[in-house]
Amino acid sequence: MSNYKFETLQLHVGQEQPDPATDARAVPIYQTTSYVFRNSAHAADRFGLRDAGNIYGRLTNSTQDVLEKRIAALEGGSAALAVASGAAAIDYAIQALAGAGEHIVAQKTIYGGSFNLLAHTLPHYGIETTFVDAHNLEEIEAAIKPYTKAVYLETLGNPNSDIPNIDAISELAHKHGLPVVVDNTFGTPYLIRPFEHGADIVVHSATKFIGGHGTSLGGIIVDSGNFDWKASGRYPGISDPNPSYHGASFADVAGPAAFVTYIRAILLRDTGAAISPFNAFILLQGVETLSLRIDRHIENTKKVVEFLSNHPLVEKVNHPSLPEHPDHALYEKYFPNGGASIFTFNIKGGQKEAHKFIDNLEIFSLLANVADVKSLVIHPATTTHSQLTDEELADQNIYQNTIRLSIGTEHIDDIIADLEKGFAAIK
């Protein structure tokens, strides 16, 4: 179906024909833990990766399979793996590349949970990270060590929607034989496909825009199929005979799907962050309306940014569509159709004013999720990024008067009227 447009692919890939068992047009929920093999030889072929198909519910599920094929197609990748959460997807992608005594280079302005994983949790497993200004290619190159295993970016940083130059960074990373991992949660494949700009691996928190309704956790890892694991020689778990899978080389067995096959067969098998069939089904419902929702998110965001930019109680709006934003040129390059419905602004005052503004909103829900059809708000410095030191917060342009908004799909008049209530409370 590669010749079809995005809006068609999001509805059909993975289930081009009705369900063969029931003739159902909708994707069924295959609520099972395990699968019957035809005979002993068939079972051995499945476990030996000689025959593709279901083995056990921790590894694969037919509902999950449709979700994986659909997201892989939307991103332009070779294969995908769905897991229990976005956090699991990010962790698996990093651990598939780096082990004890090895190193990651990461954009410093990333989601607080990803920052904590890289800065505090993975060092316990011997994986160190150097955080860099993603706009400074010299700083990125200087951070690369002989034992660096990947460069990690976000298409739109969280919470300020800053934008890295994926093309330039990918070219630099590839010069050093390194894959580039890009979190495209906020970008979505509808607006930007990182593989077209040199990235090698894409990860998503499917909980966000892909699901779109704040109902189900899920994560996705997408393999571009472009990175040559064998030629690199730096990733023996993928390229060499793997002793934990009877000597199979995933690069040989799975070809362009080697990366996600390695994660499925080794990391997911051993640590079990499996997505449930029901969550995969719910996320598929979200995928079917992804383009429609994103268009409405963008339309509303443009009007909110304009409203905030002209409000006397706003100190600064951090949105890359604004000409004064340092990433405005990159925004026009990577997001010609708009984007960044999750962004921040700095209210005049400090934490007290920020909290009072938030506490007087009615339509906006105060919660930690983003990218819901409902409008959301939070105070990053005391919640999502509260584990960061004051210095780390300032380094990410997060202050006590910073408020993060996730603009939903409600009527724009109601969204702006609600923001006015917040401002009225601090006048």
Per-segment meaning from a language model:
Residues 2, 14, 18, 80-310:
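Conserved PLP-enzyme active-site core in the AAT-like
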Residues 2-61, 69-70:
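N-terminal "arm"/small-domain region of PLP-dependent enzymes with the aminotransferase-like
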Residues 39-91, 113-120:
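Conserved N-terminal alpha-helix of the aminotransferase class I/II PLP-enzyme fold
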Residues 119, 146, 293, 359, ...:
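PLP-dependent enzyme catalytic core of the Aspartate aminotransferase-like
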Residues 151, 219-221, 317, 343, ...:
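Well-ordered beta-strand positions enriched in small/hydrophobic/aromatic, beta-favoring residues
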Residues 156, 185-187, 322, 348, ...:
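Active-site beta-loop-alpha junctions enriched in small/polar residues
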Residues 222, 344-346, 406-408:
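Short hydrophobic/aromatic beta-strand micro-patches
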Residues 271-274, 278-280, 285-289, 294-296, ...:
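Conserved small-domain helix->loop->beta segment predominantly found in fold-type I
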